[in-house]
């Protein structure tokens, strides 16, 4: 509480939040340049006013640009002259309205030009100083306004001895301006799918409940016939062009479809599972996942599932003892296939080629930024990524530590349209002072509901980096001013307000991101 505000009895007894900025903050180091390691920085007042208006416009107009890289967790190595192209192929989506909003300095330059507004080149990160081959991406606009590009001919040869690598995406704007270089998550290199019985002693290649997977089918093991399970127009399809990532959940057979409690643990054959599209949220009914060998579903196998295993998905049946129906593709449609029991082995069901799927784990990484404020032609990368927030302190002052990657000394933390004093610690840590809630409006003293503001980062050249995080201020109880002839409050009003006070006298932060 600020002691100066208690001298006037007409004022309420203190702020409605336990987070406030002490006066000593005014004499801290102020600078609009990159901060030194361990020093607090804030933009000068004359710059802060301009920046605040620009950040407010960014937040209101939603002019962000997102680069989304989607790829498999593992890649099979190629030997000799063979080329085992990555399957599913790495793909890139460009999303957000900012791709259609050009910075002022580029509008005149690009108005007379035609052709794609951005070009992409994807390859493997370099090994031992060698220049990796890259593949050009041809972006196509999707019905949902996203741009889609796919690298279908990438592979890793046996001359590359690495156990892990990353994909590198280079984006260039029309006119030759370098937008940036973006990296994927780590990809594990394997020689071939494991044929041994899997054990939970080595979980490196096992698939856990809640992880993301892709499913594809190859008729007669021919690469040209590859079809991927995907979602289009609200329906499941088998696509030769695009693939989707699905969250694979262990399901509870006693719950209704779409209302199952997620369970932890590694997925085993014979488990009841449910596939949920990570983009649309559309689900398939709960199904039993079966191991496939020689085009037969093995009904008595319960070992853990491994990367690039052949599997089948059986729909639960009310008639025990039957072979059951299985998830199957028919050209581009997804249908049910009625299997039959193997004449010689009752614990096997005969399938057709279209009912046998290959399962593989997937990864994705999103980079979001906005160039609408920036007066620079510098690349937007490295894009800072926030992974977690850690709140410390309370009462008169609180600090928030941002954990993530790609941080540098030229970044400032913003709460909504309010800049926070920021200290750079390391490429994985930024610390800021939580702004006083009074900075968000003159009516803050009488608030009875929480205030939630987005947490963003701003580079020294005004390049804006939104994040999926937000920060919530929660009010503390204080008496409202009484109006003349106002009705006396109910006897239990104080008790009610006190209970609200106990519920909300905490400051919380929440992560809002797609699941």
Curated annotation (Swiss-Prot):
InterPro entries: Beta-trefoil_DNA-bd_dom, BTD_sf, CLS_fam, Ig-like_fold, Ig_E-set, p53-like_TF_DNA-bd_sf, RBP-J/Cbf11/Cbf12_DNA-bd, RBP-J/Cbf11_DNA-bd_sf
Tissues of expression: Highly expressed in lung. Also detected in spleen, and brain.
Region annotated DNA-binding, chain positions: 76-86, 191-196, 218-223
Pfam families noted in UniProt: BTD, LAG1-DNAbind, TIG_SUH
Gene3D superfamilies given in the database record: 2.80.10.50, Immunoglobulins (2.60.40.10), LAG1, DNA binding domain (2.60.40.1450)
Keyword Ligase among record annotations: no
Keyword annotations from UniProtKB, A to Z: Activator, DNA-binding, Nucleus, Transcription, Transcription regulation
Region Disordered: start-end pairs: 1-40
Highest taxon of the lineage: Eukaryota
SUPFAM superfamilies: DNA-binding protein LAG-1 (CSL), E set domains, p53-like transcription factors
Function: Putative transcription factor, which cooperates with EBNA2 to activate transcription.
Family according to the record: Belongs to the Su(H) family.
Protein name listed in UniProt: Recombining binding protein suppressor of hairless-like protein
């Amino acid at each position: 509480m600020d002691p100066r505000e208690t001298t006037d009895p007409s004022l309420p007894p203190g702020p409605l939040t336990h987070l406030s900025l002490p006066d000593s903050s005014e004499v801290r180091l102020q600078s609009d340049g990159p901060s030194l390691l361990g020093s607090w920085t804030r933009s000068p007042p004359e710059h802060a006013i301009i920046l605040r208006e620009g950040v407010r416009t960014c937040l209101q107009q939603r002019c962000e640009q997102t680069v989304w890289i989607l790829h498999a967790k593992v890649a099979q190595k190629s030997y000799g002259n063979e080329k085992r192209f990555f399957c599913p192929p790495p793909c890139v989506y460009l999303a957000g309205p900012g791709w259609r909003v050009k910075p002022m300095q580029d509008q005149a330059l690009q108005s007379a030009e035609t052709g794609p507004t951005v070009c992409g080149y994807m390859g493997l990160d370099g090994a031992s100083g060698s220049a990796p081959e890259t593949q050009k991406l041809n972006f196509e606009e999707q019905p949902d306004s996203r741009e889609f590009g796919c690298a279908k001919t990438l592979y890793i040869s046996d001359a590359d001895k690495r156990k892990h690598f990353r994909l590198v995406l280079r984006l260039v704007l029309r006119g030759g301006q370098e937008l940036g270089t973006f990296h994927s998550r780590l990809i594990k290199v394997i020689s071939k799918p494991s044929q041994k019985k899997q054990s939970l002693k080595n979980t490196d290649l096992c698939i856990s409940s809640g992880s993301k997977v892709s499913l594809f089918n190859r008729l007669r093991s021919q690469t040209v016939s590859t079809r991927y399970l995907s979602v289009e127009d609200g329906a499941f399809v088998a696509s030769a062009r695009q693939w989707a990532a699905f969250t694979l959940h262990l399901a509870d057979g006693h719950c209704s479809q779409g209302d199952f409690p997620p369970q932890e643990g590694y997925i085993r054959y014979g488990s009841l599972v449910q596939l949920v599209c990570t983009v649309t949220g559309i689900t398939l009914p709960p199904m039993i996942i079966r191991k496939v060998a020689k085009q037969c579903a093995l009904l008595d196998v319960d070992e853990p599932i491994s990367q690039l295993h052949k599997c089948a998905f059986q729909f639960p049946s009310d008639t025990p003892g039957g072979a059951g129906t299985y998830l199957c593709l028919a050209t581009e449609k997804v249908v049910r296939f009625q299997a039959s029991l193997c004449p010689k082995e009752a614990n096997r069901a005969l399938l057709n080629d279209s009912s046998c799927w290959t399962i593989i784990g997937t990864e994705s990484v999103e980079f979001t930024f906005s160039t609408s404020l920036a007066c620079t032609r510098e690349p937007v990368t490295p894009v800072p990524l926030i992974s977690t927030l850690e709140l410390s302190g309370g009462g008169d002052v609180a600090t928030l530590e941002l954990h993530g990657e790609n941080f540098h000394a030229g970044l400032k933390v913003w709460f909504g349209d309010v800049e926070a004093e920021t200290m750079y610690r390391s490429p994985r840590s930024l610390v800021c002072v939580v702004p006083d809630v009074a900075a968000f409006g003159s009516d803050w003293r009488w608030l009875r509901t929480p205030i939630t503001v987005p947490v963003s980062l701003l580079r020294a050249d005004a390049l804006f980096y939104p994040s999926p995080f937000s920060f919530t201020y929660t009010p503390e109880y204080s008496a409202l001013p009484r109006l003349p002839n106002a009705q006396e409050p109910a006897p239990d009003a104080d008790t009610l307000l006190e209970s609200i006070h106990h519920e909300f006298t905490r400051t919380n932060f929440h992560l809002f991101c797609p699941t």
